[in-house]
Amino acid sequence: MATNGVNGAKHYNEGTFLFTSESVGEGHPDKIADQVSDAILDACLAEDPLSKVACETATKTGMIMVFGEITTKAKLDYQKVVRNAIKDIGYDDSSKGFDYKTCNLLVAIEEQSPDIAQGLHLDDRLENLGAGDQGIMFGYATDETPELFPLTLLFAHKLNAAMSAARRDGSLPWLRPDTKTQVTIEYKHDNGAVVPLRVDTVVVSAQHAPEITTEELRKEILEKIIKTTIPAKYLDEKTVYHIQPSGLFVIGGPQGDAGLTGRKIIVDTYGGWGAHGGGAFSGKDFSKVDRSAAYVGRWIAKSLVAAGLARRALVQLSYAIGVAEPLSIYVDTYGTSDKTSEELVQIIRNNFDLRPGVIVKELDLAKPIYLQTAKNGHFGTNQSFSWEKPKALKF
């Protein structure tokens, strides 16, 4: 076995364990904020692919505020962009906790600081673009699913997506946009890899219209959402369902809780698996390595697993402001690779150019693709994203 990771330590081969991941639906207040920030980013990139955007959003009852630093040639109609994003989520009436037509929008956007901008100047060539900030970023992949993504979070995301679809197509018309899910899976250890055996617990909370009873809601969610989303082979007589454990959930969205951009970074990534460097994604253009390097970290980890170099992989990258090349590259394969860490890092260096200005070209990150990443996770669920398409590695 490899010298990196845990070398198949005894406890990695014995017994089972439970692991849990949570997700939130597009109408969750923090997710509204993420989507509004990314809608503004997309509006900038649609007109000016070199826009520099750092846009935060805060929301509470009847109010949404966008604030941050944006340098762009785009002519932005903030009222239109923000209200359309809220409308698309489904908040079109104050009885649902928010209304895109009547909410108060505050805009506090300034140009990017010249001190930060000078660290990023486009030299003459995009390749020489320095990182927009210091920081550490992680990517993770696992062979437990065809998507090479943790099954706990995949199911949690899919449950929220199913509720959104049922609300939009009218099959569950009493559903409202604010939903939360949590899935616990029993796994077995397999020489450092993890193998899902069964779903142990499913938690679903869904904002709803006042006319449906809790009893009816629980029945409908179980039959029309959970059992149509999670394959029957994972559900057994011991599976526990906590559907609407609080009882009523009529008041939701920003009326129920305040929302902020960047508050759902574990939902956005790997659901507690792997590791996280702390940087959020939404509202940031590709020069912010918090986002672009996390995407390339996923691309690297997924490519390593897809190539059969490991069954599980965690990759860390680090950057400094104004410096193009990463300061460090780390990889841990949890004992599932027959290559050493040094060999794997060399394979990464030989196959990936990790300068932000090259990442943007290879992954096509100057396009207005970001609003869709802010719904149901940036990884695993949407295989059309460029970073979800493994690179053919030479080694």
Curated annotation (Swiss-Prot):
Keywords linked to the UniProt accession: ATP-binding, Magnesium, Metal-binding, Nucleotide-binding, One-carbon metabolism, Potassium, Transferase
Q: Where does K(+) bind?
A: E56
**Any binding details for the cofactor?**
Binds 2 magnesium ions per subunit. The magnesium ions interact primarily with the substrate.
Binding-site positions, ATP: H28, D178, T179, K180, S246, G247, L248, F249, D257, R263, K264, A280, K284, K288
Per its UniProt record, the required cofactor names are:
Mg(2+); K(+)
tRNA-binding among the record's keywords? no
User: Which residues of the sequence carry a binding annotation for Mg(2+)?
Assistant: E22
InterPro entries recorded = ADOMET_SYNTHASE_CS, S-AdoMet_synt_C, S-AdoMet_synt_central, S-AdoMet_synt_N, S-AdoMet_synthetase, S-AdoMet_synthetase_sfam
Give the catalysed reaction(s), semicolon-separated: L-methionine + ATP + H2O = S-adenosyl-L-methionine + phosphate + diphosphate
Concerning Pfam families, the annotation shows: S-AdoMet_synt_C, S-AdoMet_synt_M, S-AdoMet_synt_N
Listed under GO biological process in this entry are: methionine metabolic process; one-carbon metabolic process; S-adenosylmethionine biosynthetic process
One GO cellular-component annotation of the UniProt record comes to: cytosol
Residues binding L-methionine, per UniProt:
E69, Q112, D257, K288
Q: Has keyword ATP-binding?
A: yes
EC numbers, comma separated: 2.5.1.6
Pathway entry: Amino-acid biosynthesis; S-adenosyl-L-methionine biosynthesis; S-adenosyl-L-methionine from L-methionine: step 1/1
A GO molecular function assigned to this protein is:
metal ion binding
Q: What does this protein do?
A: Catalyzes the formation of S-adenosylmethionine from methionine and ATP. The reaction comprises two steps that are both catalyzed by the same enzyme: formation of S-adenosylmethionine (AdoMet) and triphosphate, and subsequent hydrolysis of the triphosphate.
Which family is this sequence assigned to? Answer: Belongs to the AdoMet synthase family.
Q: What is this protein called?
A: S-adenosylmethionine synthase
The organism is Neurospora crassa (strain ATCC 24698 / 74-OR23-1A / CBS 708.71 / DSM 1257 / FGSC 987)
Give the gene that encodes this protein: eth-1
